[in-house]
Amino acid sequence: MKIYLSKINESWIVDRVRAEWYKYNPSISTEKIKEANIIWIIAPWVWKKTPKRHLKNKKVICSYYHFDFDKFGQKEKENFYNLDQYVDEYHVISEITKKQLSSLTDKKITSIPFWVNQNIWYEIENKEELRKSFDIDDEDYLVGSFQRDTEGHDLISPKLVKGPDIFIDLVKLIYAKNKKLKVILSGKRRNYVINQLEEAGIPYRYFEMVPLDVLNKLYNILNLYLVTSRVEGGPQAIFECALTKTPILSTRVGVAPEVLHKDSIYKVGEFSKAKIDIEYAFDSAQKYTIPNGFDDFLNMFNGVKIES
């Protein structure tokens, strides 16, 4: 069995997933699509870059991360079914997405969250010194958000599936009670949240695209990380918070039910009822660390019937 992973080159989480797969699973992987028995399409939005002759002649596993059915029009349906004709099995990273995908196809769907690299994401105990390195006071209450929040077409409109409006509402709620609050932002396209924070007079620090070791440090200085998405595939931030022991509260999206305690998952309008459970999240994430996090993927690929 030889597996080829489709390329994306978008400097996104999927690029890191692809690189880690090849690094830790070299004996069953190939960078040459001609040598592969299985093509793993990990970025379905660029599937057309894969030559159709290979899609026709090899087994195809396709990953999907989430569906925003509010934006799933005729064009999106046509693209899905154009790809579906070549797909043998599907992979999703959460049970929520599995339920969404099952409404579109009767093909086999396997739900396995992506692994998380504990060599990148880990707890740093000396928080005081860490904060000093960022020139942040120890008494500041830091709330983090490290995912894009703004639509790319105008760099103004909120990307509503990510819930940046919900994030702003919650930050305002916390700030009204605690003037020591500061927001820590990272990632691309944070325009909407930054504009809203400036309008509200809420202090923030923005670390745009920092190296992973710096991002790990940023997790470690937080008092709270907020996932406010309406629709989500992962996000990997849930795993990253779990391994760094960063306090996290999330809406019920993506892998949240698989990793977080049910009390750490909040409904919009009932945020005050949510409770942080760092140890529960940390313990839940252990099965997804490397190399354990590859096991279910290996089982999935071993179950694919390859014609000799």
Roles of regions detected by a PLM:
Residues 247-250:
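Short hydrophobic beta-strand element within catalytic cores of glycosyltransferases
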Residues 88-100, 106-125, 142, 146-147:
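Donor nucleotide-sugar binding/catalytic pocket of nucleotide-sugar-dependent glycosyltransferases
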Residues 127, 132-133, 138-192:
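Conserved catalytic-core segment of nucleotide-activated headgroup transferases in glycan assembly
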Residues 230:
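Aromatic "clamp/platform" in nucleotide-sugar-dependent glycosyltransferases that forms part
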Residues 187, 191-210, 216:
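Nucleotide-activated donor-binding/catalytic signature segment of Leloir-type glycosyltransferases, i.e.
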Residues 217-222:
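Short alpha-helical donor nucleotide-sugar binding micro-motif in glycosyltransferases
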Residues 272-308:
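A charged, aromatic-enriched C-terminal amphipathic alpha-helix characteristic of glycosyltransferases
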Residues 1-46:
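N-terminal pre-catalytic "stem/leader" segment of glycosyltransferase-like enzymes
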